[in-house]
Amino acid sequence: HGMNAAIDSLMSQYHRQLWEQYRLFGLEYGTGQELEQEFSEFLEPYLEAENWYPMDLKKVEKTELVSLTDRNGQILEDQILDYMRYGLLNVRWEELSEEEAGELLRSVREAAAVEEVAEQYEGHSGEALKLEKCLESIDRCLNQQKQQWEEGGKMLEDLNGDAFIRRGQQVIRQLERVPSLVERYEEEAEALGEKLAASRNFYKQKRSDISGQIASCLEEEMAVYETYISRDGERRKEVEGLKEASSNNCQYVQNTIEEAREVQEFIDQWEPDEDGEEELDEEELWEPVIRKWDQYPHLTIGVRFGVEDQEKGDLLEQVKTMLSGKLLPLVLPEGRQASGRRPDLSGAPSVLISRDEKQSAASLLERLMIGEYILRFFNRYDEKRKDPGSCDYEMEYILFGYGGDQENLEEMALRLLTLRQGMNLIHIFSDSQKREAARNLAAAIVGGIGILPLTGVVAFLIMGVWALGEAFWDVRALFDGGKIPLVKTRDSWQLSLENLLDLGKKGALSQEGKAESSGLDYRGYGRILLFLTHGSGTDYRVMDLIQSDLRQKQEEFRMDRCAHQVDMKAGICGKHVFFSLGLWKSFFGSGDTGYELDFEVSGSYL
């Protein structure tokens, strides 16, 4: 009884502010020896009490001491879950069933997988357009060759041999550029083929996270890249022939120049006879050169390539470029600035405590409950639950762990953008009208000059950028206190393709979105991110903030000096009451009639 009472008394000295502010129990201590001393002081009154069995306390030893920061964050999770299960029995919160939690996890994982796969293929769209630009470079070079050839012909008509030779040399310079331009095209085509093969393998790895219907739509869009590469293979055979043809033409032009030099030298050296009756017929002299020059087989690229409306294609790239930079200035409401505060991480548990960076072993519902605890006890961008500690965006720090509020809010905007882009892509793939609209715009961009599969490649790019532009609107609405459905419908979709191009042109949205009465707000999406990312890292960042907060009133407070469990062993000496050696004491020696017993007890907050 005395041991149990002593350990209960010891554990009752939990840190009051830790409990009042965060509903966590922790017995603050300095050293293990101090805990042993305190336990002894609680135990001794029970031993000193008058009873039939007088006892003396010989020693006290702690056998186990478990801190809140121990066991890779599991202790913290256990206390949080204990409070959330029994401390909120009469409080309404957005609880999901195990099945609903699993469905949420599958939906978000699918969105992430679709976004990752689409991002790779969107990159291939840019690479395909780059390949088309390689062909455009070859075409420009050949057009310049033709222009110089035509000008050379005019020089011959004017019987200007020196000017013709200069033009001929310019034709040669253009022809000499062709092999390197063709080789660059071949290298880009080869690289694109290899990257597509790698992306196909990447898709196979992600396929298990993508549902059948969305996978079918995605594979249909991905197939156009294979068709493009196949058709480009046919073009490559034609383009490769330009290397040999340009070399042959160089020799042809060089031979013509040599003939022209001979004619020009003859003309320059010709002198009329003394009586001046013989005249030089220059036209007749130049006739063979002119005839040969007219027969020059000037080169053309001979294949379909490029895009007709480059401006619209550039606008799509500008949207991607704009949204790949700093997001906060674009999504924060007008007049609102991000906090520049930085949490006090000196001696932070996440820095000091060695741990395994891995997902928590908590069940899906337990992960949701831990996330709900964080939402209820820590500040975030959209709501202050309590006076701020050393940073304003505590939930965001728990999620991402950067050293300052602004960096964590920037990462929050990026994660929300990525999540929404994936969900928006799923909607586009599921909506035949939007896919058709993307193909129509792609057809307008490619026009009649490019190969047909390029239209599908550009359409995939358009769908990805469209989903990104809509995600930008979504994140801006969330930062402004609005709600966005996790899964969109045609009615809840905001951004038209016309406004998407306008976004690329102006760098801002020209339309105001419809206010949504249903869906998830910033808090709701924060709950999803906490659910997805919860692990030992988030556990320790929770402890970072608790420690930082409590240090404002108690500078030396340390989470790793808050015990969750204390086990003690006491060595107690008792004396026999009804037995004494009496006169035989000297015969048996010391005459010590006591005995020693070890007692163990454990104190824990769970």
Stretches found by the model and what they are:
Residues 1-33:
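Alpha-helical assembly-interface signal, strongest on the long, hydrophobic N-terminal helix that forms
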Residues 24-606:
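Long, compositionally biased low-complexity segments
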